[in-house]
């Protein structure tokens, strides 16, 4: 009996330790926004988890361009907006009840395009380059799309790579190490892109958002959540917060992004949640196939009333595109970005 009790207690302790290890154990410093709005000098709130902020000092290369209010709101000095740079690096030195914390943030002038056009897997169909290639991303940027969507899987040794399907050229991504995957060439001669290289290419400009889809893992939920954590960590490592919005068919992965990155804009893809459910769970928006919205036509107005953004995929027909524009959806994901651009212009 004693042995059974001891084993049970050990199992409980192990479970609690494991669950705790998945949470942020240290104070996490973040901003509620990473862009400088066109019509305002206010960027966003400085926030921290697990403790409170006593004071904030600004440092770094562009320290003199920013100021912090008494309620910890970060803003840019109006005269500094004329500086001929699209990005500013700022270090926030924060004193808390638990000690001091210093972190670098990249703030981006909000010059991102607003035309509703999201290039599905980049602009590939009419350009002759492979979908989800860096070349397809660059074509989407050149066209002037508001966003370029792409898909992320994780190798057997935990490297995120960009590809739509769980396998590439017959090779399972989740069951293959990165050293082998990264020898695979796309049709245009590019190597299979790592997420890091893809993000770096996207961050060379400040016009087109990067719409990052976290793909559910063929190995199950645990692997999907592991990928989610890798993705968010890499976005923060590269200071890519201003560029990246998140989408996924995996509801738990979406919620994990929001837990790890409370500032993140996250939309859900599967179409099995009502706007009210998404709003309750603090989603940024819904991102549903057009068939879902045809079956639930009132969801568009419901989403608007809940202040959720609305993206519809994957729409390639002119009449459907025009009808959705009349309904004033926020974004349309399409394999025909050139066609949609010709309509919105």
Predicted regions mapped to residue ranges:
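Bacterial Sec-dependent N-terminal signal peptides
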Residues: 1-22
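Phosphate-group recognition and catalysis centered on beta-loop-alpha active-site segments
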Residues: 21-59, 63, 70-345
């Amino acid at each position: 009996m004693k042995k059974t009790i001891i084993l049970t207690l050990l199992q409980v302790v192990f479970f609690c330790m494991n669950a705790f290890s998945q949470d942020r154990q240290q104070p996490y410093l973040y901003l509620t926004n990473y862009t400088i709005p066109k019509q305002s000098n206010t960027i966003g709130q400085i926030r921290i988890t697990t403790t409170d902020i006593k004071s904030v000092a600004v440092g770094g290369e562009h320290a003199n361009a920013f100021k912090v209010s008494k309620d910890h709101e970060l803003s840019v000095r109006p005269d500094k907006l004329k500086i001929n740079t699209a990005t500013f690096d700022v270090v926030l030195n924060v004193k808390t009840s638990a000690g001091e914390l210093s972190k670098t943030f990249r703030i981006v002038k909000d010059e991102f395009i607003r035309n509703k056009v999201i290039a599905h897997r980049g602009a590939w169909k009419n350009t002759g380059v492979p979908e989800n290639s860096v070349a397809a991303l660059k074509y989407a940027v050149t066209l002037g799309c508001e966003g370029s969507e792409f898909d992320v899987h994780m190798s057997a040794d935990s490297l995120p790579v960009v590809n739509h399907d769980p396998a590439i050229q017959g090779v399972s991504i989740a069951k293959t190490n990165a050293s082998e995957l990264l020898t695979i060439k796309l049709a245009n001669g590019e190597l299979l892109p790592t997420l890091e290289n893809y993000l770096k290419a996207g961050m060379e400009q400040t016009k087109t958002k990067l719409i990052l889809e976290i793909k559910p893992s063929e190995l199950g939920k645990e692997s999907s959540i592991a990928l989610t954590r890798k993705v968010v960590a890499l976005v923060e490592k590269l200071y890519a917060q201003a560029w990246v919005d998140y989408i996924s068919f995996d509801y738990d992965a979406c919620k994990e992004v929001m837990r790890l990155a409370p500032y993140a804009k996250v939309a859900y893809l599967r179409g099995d949640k009502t706007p009210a459910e998404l709003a309750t769970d603090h989603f940024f928006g819904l991102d549903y196939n057009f068939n879902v919205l045809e079956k639930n036509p009132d969801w568009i107005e419901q989403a608007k009333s809940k202040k959720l953004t609305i993206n519809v995929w994957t729409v390639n027909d002119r009449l459907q595109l025009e009808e959705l524009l009349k309904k004033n959806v926020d974004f349309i994901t399409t394999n025909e970005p050139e066609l949609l651009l010709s309509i919105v212009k």
